[in-house]
């Protein structure tokens, strides 16, 4: 990454970022806080990148479009899933006799970002949920490389991401059967080992949210999913200013 060019024009960066947030349909009341958090995140990326080799982009626009906006392009699917769970919790609470008991039965919504690397999509999603005021969503960023975890711990502190924890671990050794959603952008091809590893992280009835490219390129992966007898669907993602095709592959754990 050319660090001399990266974020050299904050106004330009903000323009692209804010337009992207608007095109994604994110609540405009959250734009100010979210854009501030994301700009700090990008500045920290610039500062650490030369030593930590976090991300390869040619300029600030590519960083915003191909990584920040791409990470946020699936936000509605995450958000709707948290609301579906919230509705079920509210229904269960309504059946309890004691209000205090009802409050105690509410549980956070857990999201894991497996192989998060520099924090994509986990950090943008964490910043989004904080900006939306949804503090019940908890994110775990799973990364095996110590230097990247050091960077992520710094990001957590600087951005005050109180909804986020950093787990230095291989995905295979991370907490099992814990997460409502397990997401990742890191794996190019989904094979049987990776699929099982990700499923092991999810709760029963939990879901995998996998960022993928063109639909025809994931046909081989969906054949594997069919053989495993899993329910799945593919959703098209519209990433502002990105000319490449993007999809979200959603797989449900039995």
UniProtKB/Swiss-Prot annotation:
Keywords: Cytoplasm, Methyltransferase, rRNA processing, S-adenosyl-L-methionine, Transferase. InterPro entries: rRNA_ssu_MeTfrase_G, SAM-dependent_MTases_sf. GO terms for cellular component: cytosol. Its main location: cytoplasm. The keyword Kinase does not apply. S-adenosyl-L-methionine binds at residues 115, 120, 171-172, 185. It comes from the Bacteria. It is found in: Cytoplasm. Its EC number is 2.1.1.-. GO terms for molecular function: rRNA (guanine-N7-)-methyltransferase activity. Belongs to the methyltransferase superfamily. RNA methyltransferase RsmG family. NCBIfam families: rsmG_gidB. Specifically methylates the N7 position of a guanine in 16S rRNA. This is Ribosomal RNA small subunit methyltransferase G. It comes from Treponema denticola (strain ATCC 35405 / DSM 14222 / CIP 103919 / JCM 8153 / KCTC 15104).
